[in-house]
Amino acid sequence: VNNCDAPNCRIKYGDNIRALVTYLNVVQCIPFKRIAELISDLCGQKISEGTVQNILKENSTKADAAYEEIRKRIECAPVVGADETGAAVGKELHWNWIFQNDLLTYVYQMKSRGQQAIDSKFPNGLPNSTLVTDRHRSYFNMNVKDHQVCLAHLLRNAEYLNELDTKQDWSRRFIHLIAHAIDLRRAGDITKRKIKVLKTKMKNLLGESLTHLDEEFESFKKGILKVKDYLFTFLTDLHVPYENN
């Protein structure tokens, strides 16, 4: 066995190590410190967190053209789903923003959860798109063709109200209306008359007084009233899904 000292020069990591670092961070969402530990344990190669960061920056730059092309295609897509989720960056809370269609997903991270985070990537909004989202206010400030509220989110909210007060039936009737709309779509049994009946029943339900119930019921109802025009878009445009999952 021959041993020698490492050469006194700048170390350059090979393509395999660089690809592995990028995969572990971008696909597996592993933080810098753990990536450095994994590379050391699996490959016997010491690597610093700073080097991990530099590799990711370099590979990110190489992907800029493709990344921008994805953004442009999302920007002109007829239907787009969007969501945002918190992400710990060091000791700070950042937000991962996701805009996607059936073929492409565009992801970016910002400190802000507000309108400026959206405008930084889509300053003109999505004027050709029906946007499928939760009820986060920033989405409804965007310039879009139309909206569809994610019904999966609403069903979870209503199920919580069921558990909060098992004696009332308001939230159960809300769930029944939403579930019936979904069943119509799945069965392909949609008519203008049935849509009109659904909307009338929802209007009547949202018009009921809930002051005798827990304040969370009234809060939920007020939130639904703000987006009531976007509950059943998926029944008139069959390209639009009823959830953004």
Question: What is each of the regions a protein language model found here?
Answer:
Residues V1-N245:
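Catalytic center-proximal scaffold of phosphoryl-transfer enzymes
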